[in-house]
A protein has these predicted regions:
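Active-site-adjacent beta-strand/loop module that shapes the phosphate/pyrophosphate-binding cleft
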Residues: 60-61, 69-93, 100-106, 125
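Conserved N-terminal beta-strand and adjoining loop/helix that marks the start
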Residues: 1-17, 38
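Charged phosphate-binding loop/patch that engages nucleotide di/tri-phosphates or the phosphate backbone
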Residues: 117-137
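A conserved beta-turn-beta hairpin within the catalytic core of GNAT-like acetyltransferases
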Residues: 26-31
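C-terminal structural segments of small proteins and small subunits
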Residues: 91, 103-120
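The catalytic Nudix box helix
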Residues: 34-66, 105
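Conserved beta-strand segments that form the floor/walls of ligand-binding pockets within enzyme
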Residues: 18, 33, 85, 102, ...
Length: 137
């Protein structure tokens, strides 16, 4: 079985997340996802994500903190999806590879038809974001 490492960006602007709608011609057409793509051999996850965001969105992103990973079997392939937070980037995202974009509150994202592999990443992001530091109660 083929194993593929994929990176995804949870892009945050003013408390809202960027969701991208997959092209009707691609895999999982019409579903919403965190933008990203495959990690090339010899490439680090942050480098791959910065490259993918430039190719897909025409932005120059500075990759922030690691969020979570999720493994899923899709069409006879094992996909290891790794999410990273992005708060800082140059340029305005453009839909070069996606049908549409939406900026939404994190909880609102569950109202979109999300790609199944992205749901646990969103849940992990929200649990970290909503966590209370020890000793702050």
């Amino acid at each position: 079985m083929q194993i593929i490492d994929v990176v995804a960006a949870i892009i945050v602007r003013e408390g809202r997340l960027l969701l991208a709608q997959r092209s009707p011609a691609g895999d999982q057409p019409g579903l919403w996802e965190f933008p990203g793509g495959k990690v090339d051999p010899g490439e680090s996850q942050p480098a791959a994500l910065a490259r993918e965001l430039h190719e897909e969105l025409a932005i120059r992103a500075r990759i922030g903190a690691y969020v979570a990973s999720h493994t899923r079997e899709v069409s006879g392939r094992v996909i290891h999806l790794h999410a990273w937070r992005v708060d800082d980037y140059d340029g305005e995202p453009q839909a070069l590879c996606h049908s549409a974009f939406v900026w939404c509150e994190p909880r609102e994202a569950f109202g979109y038809a999300l790609a199944p592999a992205d749901i646990p990443l969103l849940e992990a992001f929200m649990s970290v974001r909503d966590a209370t530091p020890a000793g702050s109660c």
